[in-house]
Regions:
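Helix-start (N-cap) detector for alpha-helical repeat units in TPR-like alpha-solenoids
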Residues: 29-31, 64-65, 98-99, 130
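Structural marker of alpha-solenoid helical repeat scaffolds
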Residues: 25-26, 59, 92-94, 123-127
Length: 132
């Protein structure tokens, strides 16, 4: 939690240090691995971030939050097709939450498929919110 708070405050190096110190190498926690990946994404270390997202997925296969964050990593780079692949996989998981589905709607909309994006978004939102 401390590492995430530091990252939210823009203190990425301190956040990275906190997350790494909290990790137990013998029994890695997928949440900490994913948090470290997200921080590396913020530091524009995409390759290292994606490697860690994949490690988190090895520890917790098909975890929607990790798949979604991996997809967002590709969004930040402008690779919307790859991003959509990960986002769709995330959204199809039984335990996917609203944020995951909204991220899918975002990446579909960024590709100009507005009707499809609105349909995805409207599953969670009022019609007015989905059109916004």
């Amino acid at each position: 939690a401390y590492g995430k708070a530091l990252a939210a405050n823009g203190q990425f190096e301190a956040a990275l240090d906190a997350v790494r110190r909290a990790q137990t190498p013998e029994y890695p926690d997928w949440r900490l691995v994913s948090a470290e990946a997200a921080i590396l994404d913020q530091l524009n270390q995409k390759d290292d971030a994606r490697q860690l997202y994949r490690k988190a997925l090895e520890l917790k296969p098909n975890e929607p939050s990790v798949l979604s964050n991996l997809g967002m990593s590709y969004v930040l780079e402008g690779d919307l097709r790859t991003a959509e692949t990960y986002m769709r996989s995330a959204a199809q998981q039984q335990n996917a939450d609203s944020r995951v589905r909204q991220n899918l709607a975002l990446v579909v909309g960024l590709q100009g498929r507005f009707d499809e994006a609105e349909k995805i978004a409207s599953q969670e939102l009022s019609p007015e919110q989905a059109q916004a």
